[in-house]
From Swiss-Prot:
Enzyme class, first EC level, given as a word: translocase
Gene: MT-ND3
Keyword Membrane tagged: yes
Membrane topology, record value: Multi-pass membrane protein
Highest classification ranks of the organism: Eukaryota, Metazoa, Chordata, Craniata, Vertebrata
Protein name as it appears in the record: NADH-ubiquinone oxidoreductase chain 3
Family, per entry: Belongs to the complex I subunit 3 family.
GO-annotated molecular function: NADH dehydrogenase (ubiquinone) activity
Described function: Core subunit of the mitochondrial membrane respiratory chain NADH dehydrogenase (Complex I) that is believed to belong to the minimal assembly required for catalysis. Complex I functions in the transfer of electrons from NADH to the respiratory chain. The immediate electron acceptor for the enzyme is believed to be ubiquinone.
Transmembrane parts of this sequence: 3-23, 56-76, 87-107
Catalysis performed (reactions): a ubiquinone + NADH + 5 H(+)(in) = a ubiquinol + NAD(+) + 4 H(+)(out)
InterPro entries xref list: NADH_UbQ/plastoQ_OxRdtase_su3, NDAH_ubi_oxred_su3_sf
One Gene Ontology term, aspect cellular component: mitochondrial membrane
Any single Pfam family the record assigns to this protein: Oxidored_q4
Amino acid sequence: MNLITTIITITITLSAVLATVSFWLPQISPDAEKLSPYECGFDPLGSARLPFSLRFFLIAILFLLFDLEIALLLPLPWGDQLNTPTLTLVWSTAVLALLTLGLIYEWTQGGLEWAE
């Protein structure tokens, strides 16, 4: 018990010291030169931060969701060794059904249409 108390005390103390030092050390002095974009030594012709397509963002979110689905369903073949393999199958089917319904909804709303 003393070891846990010691570790927690050291952790809290170290965190407080590092947070305090991080507020004291930096001398922030933003000027026009630091805030301007840098493009290989040339003056920028336009805005350095161009907006990207919202459709690209939606496709990226869908990719992440289905990538997560694959990661969740990858250990499914070993699910038959659990105590209740039918419960594992029911949960995995529910996850697949929910993601399929979401994909169908996105498709019907036109979210997957790249060109208008």
